[in-house]
Amino acid sequence: MRHPACNLLLLTALLLFSHIPLLHAASSESRVALVIGQSAYRAVPALPNAGNDARRMAELLGSAGFAVTSAPDLSQNDMRQAISDFAAKVSASGPDTVALVFYAGHGLQIDGENYLVPVDLDPKREADVPLQAVRLNDLMNTLGALPTKMRIVMLDACRNNPFPALSGTTGHGLALVDTKAGASGTFISYSTSPGAEAEDGNGDDSPYTTAVLSVTKEPNLPIEEAFKRIRVAVNQATEGRQIPWESSSLTADFKFFATDSGQQAATAPKPAEPNPLVPEAQRVEVWHRTLQGKEPKVAYELVIADDSVAAYEAFAALYSQAPYGPRVRSLLERRREMIAWADAVAVNTAPAFAAFLASYPIGDLAATAHDGRARP
């Protein structure tokens, strides 16, 4: 028979621990993840941090309740098979599934199309890339066709182009992707802005993955707020050289971790986004009023977190001095160029590429635009 004092001790312990929040995966949905880390490239120097990033992300996602499939150093055939096997796993998990893909390695854009780079890619000319690589759109379309609750794609894939045969023929970084044009319930994150290159980092992990590993561990943090903080953290770590970017068509909230008190909020509908039909000038004016009178550093971090053209335009009008003014103007110019490029690629006619060249006659996309303008 248990002694009364022991019973009292047990009751006290239960009461004490009942008031301590329990950290766990944020909801009861099924969670599956595919983590690809491409380090051992055969035709170009290795990317050691990509493998490190993938291993650390697999650990994080496992602790967040994901059933993780790790797939390192994939050839083209292996990558396609891994995506196919993952799609089957997602489908078998049912419609209440969060499917997440993390990719670390090289990425390329050819003619406005983004490609994930297998370790056996060895192009002799630009035309070899579509034959030897894996289209990002193929991954997105495969996930988009599955009846899932949510699709999350994280790409630490915008490192410099290391292939000599492609020097001067491809655009920098990756092309802009708009999730609103595909399946709803999709979130895609780039490690840097469209048309920009990401850093591999001086430590064991890239600046992007370092920030992801730190920020997402905070309990009850909605995914879109998490990636705003990740953007600011990476921007600070790289002194403005790298700014992560994301596109979202999510219709429900998602949190990597939650306490018991955050469970109900984890499944609540997302608040309505700002009306996209509001004129750009009006959005700029709202940001102008928001930033007015703020210290440059505070205003800079606000617009970096928002990462919208309207926010950058308002900042550029108010703050001209270094270091923040030139950074934002450069970022704004490149963002406008990448939006114009995405529009030209979507229309895909000679007049569309001619219009792009009229605004952007020089730069890393000009050669491809000239080819597009010359098409019959």
Language-model segments: residues:
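Alpha-helical segment of the N-proximal tetratricopeptide repeat
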Residues: K294-A314, L318, I339-A355, S359
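Cysteine endopeptidase catalytic domains of the caspase/legumain-like
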Residues: R2-Y300, A310-R327, T368
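A compositionally biased, intrinsically disordered/low-complexity signal enriched
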Residues: W287, L291, W341, R373-P376
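Compositionally biased low-complexity repeats
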Residues: A25-S27, Y41, E337, A358, ...
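Short, charge-rich amphipathic alpha-helical segments embedded
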Residues: A317-R336, I362-P376
